[in-house]
Amino acid sequence: MLISELLQTPLGIFFVGLFSLMVGSFLNVVIYRVPVMMDREEKQYAWQVFHGEDSVCPEIPKQRFNLLVPASRCPHCGHRIRAIENIPVISWLFLKGKCSGCGAAISARYLLVELLTAALSVIVAFHYHDPLSLGFALVFTWTLIALCFIDAEHQLLPDRLTLPLLWLGILAALFNVFINLESSVIGAMIGYLSLWSVYWLFKLITGREGMGYGDFKLLACLCAWQGAWMLPIILFSAAILGMIYALGIGLRMGKPMPFGPFLAIAGWLTFLYGAQIGQLFGYFPA
């Protein structure tokens, strides 16, 4: 009860935002390292197929590389990032977006992820005051942020993020946090099969692939958290966001944008404002 009351005060919201800044810093590690880890695993697997299970690909560095080790370094000069240089937001601004070792530019994405994580977490904290609901909702939000940026940069929606998010949604439903267990499981199934069907229909007609399997899994995750009845709203919202991007930024850049980020954004908006969006589209009665 005391925690619930604290979460409704400005001080509680402030602490959520402050903690989320640190989470945003970790999400930057996830966004950078998970694709590298996947690439190394694929190279090692391909090498073992041709050279035996006990062989080691010489292109892969021998040093351990995961989300915890080694310590963060500048990708340009290898300068080790000191603790004082790793303070969320402040360090990037103090260093003026440059490495203290070589002066190379540090991507503004690091600053954006930290600020975005804090901002979205504060919004979530305004919606959910119950500690259990808030905890689940924050993890949902943080995972979508990581997936959004990874897919935008690498056209990847890693199983090591989508599958835990799917099971976490089902776990939340087991305790009736957002929806019940039956709705969660059915939602996951329908969410996956809907895009899977579109994928194969498009491929049969055109002979080309219109999206990746990661999109199926991401939509399954979103529906596991919200139920199958939110599927039309999520897809329609994602399509609108994609069209806005294509007509605006996409045409100028001449670069295709994966569907995952639009699904993630639409899924998060629907998670918090699904009823309002549904009324706007006439899906739910006002």
Swiss-Prot record:
Subcellular location: Cell inner membrane
Membrane topology, as annotated: Multi-pass membrane protein
Stated role: Plays an essential role in type IV pili and type II pseudopili formation by proteolytically removing the leader sequence from substrate proteins and subsequently monomethylating the alpha-amino group of the newly exposed N-terminal phenylalanine.
GO terms assigned for molecular function: aspartic-type endopeptidase activity; metal ion binding; methyltransferase activity
Family: Belongs to the peptidase A24 family.
Catalysis performed (reactions): Typically cleaves a -Gly-|-Phe- bond to release an N-terminal, basic peptide of 5-8 residues from type IV prepilin, and then N-methylates the new N-terminal amino group, the methyl donor being S-adenosyl-L-methionine
Protein's UniProt name: Prepilin leader peptidase/N-methyltransferase
Membrane spanning residue stretches: 11-31, 106-126, 132-152, 161-181, 185-205, 231-251, 257-277
Entry's cofactor comment: Zinc is required for the N-terminal methylation of the mature pilin, but not for signal peptide cleavage.
Gene Ontology CC: plasma membrane
Predominant location category: membrane
Domain of life: Bacteria
Binding positions for Zn(2+) per the UniProt entry: 74, 77, 99, 102
PANTHER family: PREPILIN LEADER PEPTIDASE_N-METHYLTRANSFERASE-RELATED, TYPE 4 PREPILIN-LIKE PROTEINS LEADER PEPTIDE-PROCESSING ENZYME
Keywords for this protein: Cell inner membrane, Cell membrane, Hydrolase, Membrane, Metal-binding, Methyltransferase, Multifunctional enzyme, Protease, S-adenosyl-L-methionine, Transferase, Transmembrane, Transmembrane helix, Zinc
GO biological process, one term: signal peptide processing
Gene3D superfamilies linked: 1.20.120.1220
EC number: 3.4.23.43, 2.1.1.-
Record's keyword annotation contains Nucleotide-binding: no
